[in-house]
């Protein structure tokens, strides 16, 4: 991983392939667009992968494959990194704000790509429409607890509201019992 755990251990299957799209990808400033793709695919890209990469890059508005990465805008860098993680198969795809710097047509293209993806998708995003269209299970980490919802984002919102209302109802019931106990003790135990 990118971070060393404070404690415990990280256990990963030996053949598990994980691809990660950072929010702010970094590249070697002297590499060209195609060299950057080569460097990010975990092996030397074959001809078919390069053809696919060029098609994806073109679809995302990057057509000068010999352009140096230092000349790319932030949005172009994000799109280059996106192509680099999508070009080769993986088991787990971790995406940090994948729709940043994408217009609606590009976001639709990415949506279709991710809907066809058969691995696990872990995503951080503020794009609720996109989240609703590409997810079928949501795992929420809230106050140190993990909650799992076999729902799209819209269903998750409903189920989360129900869970939170149940917690509030339990707390109201607990408070009511405590008030009765305090009243009973105040009157004196008999």
Task: Identify the residue ranges that each predicted region occupies.
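Short cytosolic helices in intracellular loops of multi-pass membrane proteins
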Residues: 172-188
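Conserved short loop/turn motifs at secondary-structure junctions
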Residues: 70-71, 188-190
